[in-house]
Structure formats: C-alpha cells, structure tokens
From Swiss-Prot:
PROSITE patterns: RIBOSOMAL_L14
Organism expressing this protein natively: Salmonella arizonae (strain ATCC BAA-731 / CDC346-86 / RSK2980)
Pfam families named in the record: Ribosomal_L14 (PF00238)
Keywords on record: Ribonucleoprotein, Ribosomal protein, RNA-binding, rRNA-binding
One example of a Gene Ontology biological process annotation: translation
Cellular component, GO, one term: cytosolic large ribosomal subunit
NCBIfam families: rplN_bact (TIGR01067)
Protein family: Belongs to the universal ribosomal protein uL14 family.
Coiled-coil stretches noted in the UniProt entry, renumbered to this chain: none
Listed name of the protein: Large ribosomal subunit protein uL14
InterPro entries assigned to the protein according to its UniProt record, in alphabetical order: Ribosomal_uL14, Ribosomal_uL14_bac-type, Ribosomal_uL14_CS, Ribosomal_uL14_sf
SUPFAM superfamilies in the record: Ribosomal protein L14
Length: 123
C-alpha cells in the first residue's frame, strides 16, 4: 500500500537510491498503489554519475511492498520493504538495465515483461 509521501527503495541500476511517491496514477481520487501499479515519484537520494539526479520527477512501477500481495489460493507474498523500478516518462519502459531482488508474478503483463526478464527471481 503505497500512498503520497511514501519513501521507497529503488530496485534497479538507474542511479537513484531512495524516491518518494508524489502521486498514485490511475483515477482522480485513488489513494493507494500496490504491486504492479504505476506511481509518480521524485528522486530524493541518488548516486553520482547515475542516469537520474536528485529532484527529477519520473514514473515508477511498484515491485515490492511490505503490505504484500494476496494470491487467489489465499497465500500472501510480503517483503521487508517497499521498492519500485523507475520508468521512462513516455515509453513506460525501465530506465535501468538491471533489476535487484525478487519481483512478483503479478507484474507479468505485456507492459512489464521487460522487468520480469531482467529480474533475478520471480515469486
């Protein structure tokens, strides 16, 4: 459950370390985002010589949440922290070329197959 002002870790090599959600996309009064939802973020902490810099406003897809994802069989997949993958604002494809840590199977649609293929583990 990601909402405005939530701080997230970044699970790719775009150069950002910490980001903050500034808007949940997909509806005029939508409050929460879960795994697979697109959010608008601003970079709060970045490494030198990265692809992004502090203060940039971009889109990102949520890949891990502490709240977790409930599967149809009743099981819940939870993680230790909230993480996202930064996307290009126009094409909505990942900026980074590597993904760190596991991602969930809920990302497996036409939009995010690139993230699934780059991820080291799909749960």
């Amino acid at each position: 459950m990601i909402q405005e002002q939530t701080m997230l870790n970044v699970a790719d090599n775009s150069g950002a370390r910490r980001v903050m959600c500034i808007k949940v996309l997909g509806g005029s009064h939508r409050r929460y985002a879960g795994v697979g939802d697109i959010i608008k973020i601003t970079i709060k902490e970045a490494i030198p010589r990265g692809k992004v810099k502090k203060g940039d406003v971009l889109k990102a897809v949520v890949v891990r949440t502490k709240k977790g994802v409930r599967r149809p069989d009743g099981s819940v997949i939870r993680f230790d922290g909230n993480a996202c993958v930064i996307l290009n604002n126009n094409s909505e494809q990942p900026i980074g070329t590597r993904i760190f840590g596991p991602v969930t199977r809920e990302l497996r649609n036409e939009k995010f197959m690139k993230i699934i293929s780059l991820a080291p583990e799909v749960l």
